[in-house]
Swiss-Prot record:
One of its GO terms (cellular component) is extracellular region. 'Daisho' is the Japanese term for a matched pair of samurai swords, one short and one long, and refers to the role of the two Daisho peptides (Dso1 and Dso2) in defense against fungal infection. The gene is Dso2. Disruption phenotype: Adult males infected with spores from F.oxysporum or F.verticillioides display reduced survival. GO terms for biological process: antifungal humoral response; defense response; innate immune response; response to bacterium. Keywords: Immunity, Innate immunity, Secreted, Signal. This is Daisho2. Its main location: secreted. It comes from Drosophila melanogaster. Induction: By bacterial and fungal infection (at protein level). Detected within 24 hours of bacterial infection (at protein level). Induced by Gram-positive bacteria M.luteus (at protein level). Residues 1-22 form the signal peptide.
């Protein structure tokens, strides 16, 4: 179960890096919400 969350997190992170030019993105991974701004900063929320 923990491996599934980690794999999902890395998958979402890779997907975010692949589409970084899209601007602000909201990523749901591992039970957390990662918000990527145009400055490539991540805000982590539970």
């Amino acid at each position: 179960m923990n491996c599934l969350k980690i794999c999902g997190f890395f998958f979402a992170l890779i997907a975010a890096l692949a589409t970084a030019e899209a601007g602000t993105q909201v990523i749901h991974a591992g039970g957390h919400t990662l918000i990527q701004t145009d400055r490539s900063q991540y805000i982590r929320k539970n």
